[in-house]
């Protein structure tokens, strides 16, 4: 089974429905193969908390979080994070701390990270990426 982990930006586009190509690709994949990291969940909820969004968007975020499988941050993800961060620092590669955590979580979960963020492509080998 191929598992796809949506990063925060892709999850936001899914919720907003503003990029048809993402929606088309998403509906072609069984929902039980689509996951997000608990880090992405936290980022989505933070985004709602810091701004006064219309109630409709808040409802859509919560509906999305009910429907998608959310993988908890665990020991395996933390182990991969430590190794990945050390390798990136040694190679002079910088990524935001939360992006680094999401990348590590996708690797630990043996998932393909779905992203449109080119920063993830700088990560040394081991992270599988798809741009939807």
Predicted segments, located by residue:
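Amphipathic alpha-helical recognition patches that constitute DNA-binding helices
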Residues: 21, 35, 60, 76, ...
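Active-site neighborhoods of divalent-metal-dependent phosphate/nucleic-acid chemistry enzymes
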Residues: 68-114
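Short, well-structured N-terminal submotif of metal-dependent ribonuclease cores
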Residues: 1-36, 48-65
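Generic structural signal for small/hydrophobic residues in well-ordered secondary structure
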Residues: 7-8, 22, 44, 81, ...
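Acidic, PIN/NYN-like endoribonuclease modules and their adjacent C-terminal/linker elements
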Residues: 1-3, 103, 107-132
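A generic structural signal for short hydrophobic patches within well-formed alpha-helices
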Residues: 11, 41-44, 78, 120
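Histidine- and aromatic-rich ligand-binding microenvironments
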Residues: 7, 37, 94-96, 117
């Amino acid at each position: 089974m191929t598992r796809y982990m949506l990063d925060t930006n892709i999850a936001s586009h899914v919720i907003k429905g503003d990029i048809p190509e993402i929606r088309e690709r998403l509906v072609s994949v069984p929902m039980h193969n689509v996951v997000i990291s608990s880090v992405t969940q936290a980022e989505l909820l933070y985004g709602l908390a810091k701004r006064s969004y219309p109630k409709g968007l808040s409802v859509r975020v919560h509906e999305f979080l009910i429907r998608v499988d959310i993988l908890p941050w665990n020991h395996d993800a933390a182990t991969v994070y430590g190794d990945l961060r050390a390798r990136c620092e040694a190679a002079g590669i910088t990524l935001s701390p939360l992006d680094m955590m999401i990348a590590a979580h996708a690797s630990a979960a043996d998932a393909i990270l779905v992203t449109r963020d080119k920063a993830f492509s700088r990560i040394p080998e081991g992270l599988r990426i798809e741009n939807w």
